[in-house]
């Protein structure tokens, strides 16, 4: 259901390369001026011109603490991506705030509902968002039903057992809404399910399969060396096993790598030399080499995509919960001094073909 030409999707090409640009609107409002080769540049256009074909964006239900990642902000982001010639992956968090492989806090409006009520709410919300995007001419090409759903959807936490009857009901409700919207609006939309860190993929999808979660097109994996026990070879083995066992495409849908240990502000950075992989120095060249080798690993093992997380989360005067600036500026794809596009963007334009095993 995926095609390398934007915005419509058709047959699957060898590879999707892209980035999550959920921060761009906010960074620009905070005063960030992005450059490419020293000239003013739009990050969406930079992504496209360097060889990318897909943009990912997150959506929160009712984030009263911010005006970003709301429906209106996401509509603006998707519109910018499509205008730049990019396809769009819409990431439903099904939450009012960040959810990830540690926690899946439900939206406040759904927190006290029983499973049947939550399934209806999740289905209807998903369908409503997609119907509104269709009316605006901005349907995404791919939809994530949940973000890093290692714990149970709508309430689970790391280490807690998953009630798979409930979890399957919720996941299938979201999947059904995407399928219905796709049919109603006459546009193919691929469904992705997303798990953090490769070591968790096979156990989770085995459980999901046994519980009847079967109707999806893409397996998305977050891969960060800081939080994974696996090197690139280990990641490759998981990708190979997953696409063979489940018959789905497999993407590394989140990844990043630091290019410096320097700080541009007082926020503690999440990545750096403490999470570097052997052979990949924390430098602009090391960042580029990591992305090239990661993508080659994906391709060699039958995978279909790599998406960089938050290349646009640069340091600005704005405050976050963690301090002024960014916790990621040293792992962005724009430099700290001038927000000029880094050499790592060239990873997007390289030709990748599977190597014989």
What are the functions of these language-model segments?
Residues 12-13, 42-51, 76-87, 131-139, ...:
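Acidic (Asp/Glu)-rich catalytic clusters
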Residues 12-87, 93-122, 220:
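N-terminal substrate-binding region of glycoside hydrolase catalytic domains
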Residues 22-24, 60-62, 93-97, 145-150, ...:
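Active-site beta-loop-alpha junctions enriched in small/polar residues
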Residues 70-73, 100-210, 214-216, 228-237, ...:
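Active-site cleft segment of glycoside hydrolase catalytic domains centered on the general acid/base Glu
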């Amino acid at each position: 259901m995926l095609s390398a030409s934007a915005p419509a999707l058709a047959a699957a090409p060898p590879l999707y390369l892209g980035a999550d640009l959920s921060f761009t609107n906010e960074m620009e409002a905070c005063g960030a001026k992005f450059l490419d080769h020293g000239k003013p540049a739009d990050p969406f256009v930079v992504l496209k011109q360097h060889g990318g074909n897909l943009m990912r964006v997150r959506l929160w239900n009712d984030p009263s603490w911010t005006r970003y990642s709301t429906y209106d902000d996401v509509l603006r982001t998707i519109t910018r991506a499509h205008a730049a010639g990019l396809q769009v992956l819409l990431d439903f968090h099904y939450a009012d705030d960040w959810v990830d492989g540690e926690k899946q806090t439900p939206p406040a409006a759904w927190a006290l509902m029983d499973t049947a009520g939550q399934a209806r709410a999740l289905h209807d919300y998903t369908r409503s968002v997609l119907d509104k995007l269709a009316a605006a001419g901005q349907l995404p090409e791919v939809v994530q039903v949940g973000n890093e759903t290692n714990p149970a959807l709508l309430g689970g936490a790391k280490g807690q057992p998953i009630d798979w009857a409930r979890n399957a009901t919720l996941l299938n409700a979201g999947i059904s809404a995407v399928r219905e919207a796709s049919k109603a609006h006459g546009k193919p939309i691929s469904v992705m399910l997303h798990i953090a860190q490769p070591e968790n993929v096979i156990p989770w999808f085995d459980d999901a399969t046994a519980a009847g979660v079967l109707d999806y097109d893409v397996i998305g994996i977050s891969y960060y060396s800081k939080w994974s026990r696996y090197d690139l070879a280990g990641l490759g083995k998981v990708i190979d096993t997953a696409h063979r066992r489940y018959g789905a495409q497999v993407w590394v849908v989140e990844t990043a790598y630091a290019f410096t240990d320097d700080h541009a502000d007082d926020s503690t950075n999440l990545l750096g030399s403490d999470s570097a992989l052997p052979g990949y120095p924390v430098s602009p060249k090391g960042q580029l080499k990591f992305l090239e080798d990661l993508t080659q690993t994906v391709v060699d093992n039958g995978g279909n995509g790599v998406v960089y997380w938050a290349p646009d989360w640069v340091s600005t005067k704005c405050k976050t919960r963690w301090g002024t600036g960014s916790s990621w500026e040293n792992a962005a794809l724009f430099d700290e001094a001038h927000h000029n596009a880094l050499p790592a963007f060239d990873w997007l334009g390289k030709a990748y073909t599977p190597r014989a095993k």
